Amino acid sequence: MTEAYDHSPDEVESREELDYHLAKGSLAGLTIQGLALDRDPPDLSTVDVSNTLFVACRITDPELVADLTRRGAIVVPDLHNRLYPTHPSRLYAPEDLAAGHRNGFEGLYDTRVYRHFVAHGGALADIREALAQRLHDHGIDDALNDTIDAWTAASGGPVIGVMGGHAEPRGSRAYRHAAEIGRRLAVAGCLVVTGGGPGVMEAANLGAAASTAQPEHLTTLIDQLAAAPRFDDGDAYTRKALEVRELLPPEGAADAVAWARHGGLSVPTWLYGHEPANLFAARIAKYFSNAIREDTILRLARGGLVFAAGRAGTVQEVFQAATKAFYATDGASGPFVFLDTEFWTGTLPVEKLLRPLLADSPYGDLAKLVHVTDDVDEAVELLRHGAPATARDTQRTTP
């Protein structure tokens, strides 16, 4: 059965899986992703390839491409001269984004892709670059769905989003609170997802990454990170993160669940690539499109959301999430937990707007979703027990 390979039976993403189908004599209707078919080339001359989609596979023989096309296949090549894959078949790992760190912040793979992004027009790229970026983001979508489907099938736990200010310094009270929430949620079997930036987002992934260690180990890690508290100095900030990563519990054998307790998920964007990469998530779904990225985070986090203090970006996420809850766009929502009473009732009193808004939802009075607290224990309990029964079925990036 194809399920022996992964949770996407119509997609072939390894040579072993390809060989399995070749032995059956048919690739008809399948999608073959990201395989190096120029290495020990498989014999495709007699296999059925009608309606087979080859995406970003390395095929160096033009006659083979022509033959596959004549026989009913569609071949979408990996676009050349890009620093990034135009159809990634898996999510990024911290090691991918940090590659080249010996040459400083500017040498990081993550930074080099960001410089490429800016040099080619950023969010307003020319048609060729825009196409390459869209193909890349589609590949991330697909890899993320595979990852979440596998995790949900094996775990069944809810996905919880943690939002908040990117400028929150390492070692601050809010940073420590977010890290502790991330740790406790991971221990409770939840998947922590963040926007993949620094500040509160880094803290939550760090907490999840330390969730298999003793609680006091997290304090030690934060104390060490606090030696490089702000991301203005990308070199020092990244160097300290890499040092602390060496002190994290090892992930061990890869499976569909364990990674959630070794950092969880982050969903960053190269639109904000001037900020150092958050290197504490175990799986990283990095997009070029910030609009897709924002929607993806909120679509996944059906189990609930934590909003630590933040400014414009966080407030945008608050009301985008509220809109989704109001119209049940992605199904029922878990609780909205606002951490820092003074900030959310005084500085930016969103509670006064959200409660009457959500009370008038066509799906009933949803004002009860809104909670404001300073208590980490209360926040975690609300999230652990507040996920809707439908969360398991709706925490996907696509229907």
Predicted regions span which residues?
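Acidic/glycine-enriched connector segments
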Residues: 23, 27-28, 32-41, 47-48, ...
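Short, acidic/small-residue loops that bind anionic groups at enzyme active sites
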Residues: 216-224, 266, 308-309, 315, ...
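Structural motif
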Residues: 195-196
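Short glycine/serine/threonine-rich phosphate/pyrophosphate-binding segments
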Residues: 171, 200-204, 313-320
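Active-site donor-nucleotide binding/catalytic segment of nucleotide-sugar enzymes
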Residues: 154-168, 185
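C-terminal functional extensions of proteins
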Residues: 297-299, 333-399
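Glycine-rich phosphate/diphosphate-binding loop of Rossmann-like nucleotide-binding domains
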Residues: 172, 183-188
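Long, compositionally biased, glycine/small-hydrophobic-enriched stretches that function as flexible linkers
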Residues: 1-135
